[in-house]
Amino acid sequence: MLFRSAIPGLPQKSGKVRDVFDLGDKLLMVVTDRISAFDVILPCGVPDKGKVLNQLSLFWMEFFGMKNHLVTANVDEYPAELKPYKEDLRGRSMLVKKVKMVEVECIARGYLTGSGWKEYQKSGTVNGMKLREGYENASKLDEVLFTPTTKAAIGDHDEAINFAETVQLVGEKTAALLRDTTVSLYSKAADYARERGIIIADTKFEFGLDADGSLILADEVLTPDSSRFWPVSSYAVGKNPPSLDKQYVRDWLDSINFNHQPPGPVLPDDVISRTREIYLKAFKDLSGREIV
């Protein structure tokens, strides 16, 4: 298990799960086995989680064929200065181009659940958009919704923004491109996943901008950390389906009345073990592969 990575001499920034090292013209992204919930990094890791996130992101980048920030994920092709760390990096890292990241998190919702369901119950809206009456928890939406948020610093919460606010942040052309690309990628992935027995209820994409203004798919793509995955076999409208994602950990934390503030509690061994099983199953069901 890798909870924290360190490469002496290289500038480093750490997110909730990823450690990013600056190599000058490129970045090394290392996906650790850390896990966060409710924007709180928990003090224990989940073995193989980082490998699942990294390798599933690589799978989807290949699947979409869209321009992305990947240079290589083959550690044998990494710069010589990384050679001493090769085995720690294998399977859980990628070398990527530096791109100008768009400061909007792009969420696609195909089903009404989570915060969207809570808002709909109160006001009949999701992200301020009025929806028809009659939806239940976990209902499939009539159309895929684009519900962007701001990008918050670690420990802070992302704030939902509407399309007009997205335009104010990034301009009308880029906002429309973010919306259309997010919905298109989600729809393509959702059709594929359903054939593999998984419903993608919602997911989050992040994009960068190339020098010519075109979008680049970046960061993580359709992982159990950034998505809600439901088995088709146990899906039913009106109740929360069991999930193949981080929801299992969130539910356990709520069951012990965790207040969603740091420090987070240590997860029991059985919760860690079950979380690992969930992540590995999501990877295998979606990709048809085993992690390496």
Residue map of PLM features:
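Active-site loop/lid in soluble adenylation, ligation, and acyl-transfer enzymes
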Residues: 1-149, 260-266, 270-292
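Catalytic cores of nucleic-acid ligases and guanylyltransferases
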Residues: 32, 89, 188, 215-224
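Surface-exposed helix-capping loop/turn segments at secondary-structure junctions
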Residues: 66-70, 188-200, 213, 287-292
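Short, active-site-adjacent segments that bind or coordinate small-molecule cofactors and metal centers
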Residues: 97-99, 195-203, 208-210, 276
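Conserved metal-phosphate-binding beta-hairpin within the catalytic cores
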Residues: 108, 200-221
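A short mid-domain helix/strand-loop element embedded in enzyme catalytic domains
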Residues: 139-172
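A long amphipathic alpha-helix within ATP-dependent nucleotide-binding catalytic cores
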Residues: 170-201
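C-terminal helix-cap and adjacent tail motif
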Residues: 221-282
